């Protein structure tokens, strides 16, 4: 089993490739000669941008849905803040000055790609150390130039609080954590209506590596790759994912999301089409998790626990979750609950059409699992098509139907554990092939 990746050293503690004074000079005197270019709308002078005060009233985030004298609401007006022309040098200068002045809101140009060609302390942009908001517009992108040396796009350090609105972050590549964004301990990241795509990390967190606090709102994290864990998101801190899509990412463990040692909350959205050696979708490793109203579908893994895995003293609650069409080459196509002090509660949910080559097509349980008002339908494995149990499973008002085992235990195969059907609550185990249950008291074979 893969062990959680340790947080990397704060990039500010590493040997600096460029002295910090140079970037202060850049931010205050105008950015020239840094081999950074952009494509898009013609740029204004970076010096003009750098010279503005980024902490005036106009630069602060809006706090309410007020209307101006013309009667227009917030959604009809440009967000308050300092405009940054379509020029990577100008963006670097603006962030540098924002850090110096205690934070700012920066409005990036629409239909613009800010093209970064040289790293600053392992990232294409200056480390975020204060509250900074980057507002994108239509088709605003920040990317690393394809021919440039490897670096991630953004690092959020202690005291930094970065908000991304309507932005695409792409092309980051690092031999450490966080292909696109690294959030260090004491840092915070919020993405709203943004896309993190096609980034690569040689270790953990192909899209985002979170060691602080990260919130992903109405955003997409897709097509990122990590050689270790967390193809989309690797988190050792607090992680909230709301109405977002973590899809088509690749990792050795936790293709979509890997959470270790803290808490992950996923609400709505999807974790779909991810690939991994172990657990294509969501891997909760020595952590706590709550998933509500999310589709966890079409994930694949060559190991165990493809849709969701709960392991290494972890707890997970899933409500109104659709875990369907996931495929494992070993066990636990839909849900895998590891041996020992691991606990899963599944309520008002569906585990359907999941497949495991060997055992536990729908659920593989070696810990403790509780199913309430849940359907385990149409899953398939060699043994234990619906559920394979080595631990304790309690079912309440749950249906285990139309599952298939090639050998035995079409519905439930109990292998030395405890299965409590609680049939008085309405639990039924029927229409499974070649049989409904093996070693399950109160279940007709």
Q: What are the functions of these language-model segments?
A:
Residues 120-123, 147-155, 175-182, 201-209, ...:
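Extracellular beta-strand/beta-solenoid scaffold signature
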Residues 80-106:
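Acidic Gly/Asp/Thr-rich repetitive segments characteristic of extracellular carbohydrate-active
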Residues 395-445:
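Leucine-rich solenoid repeat scaffolds
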Residues 1-7, 11-46:
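Secretory targeting and sorting signals
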Residues 104, 112, 130-132, 138-140, ...:
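The right-handed parallel beta-helix/beta-solenoid scaffold, focusing on the short coil/turn
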Residues 159-254, 261, 265:
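Right-handed parallel beta-helix
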Residues 96, 116-133, 143-164, 170-188, ...:
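Extracellular beta-strand-rich solenoid/capping regions of secreted or surface-exposed proteins
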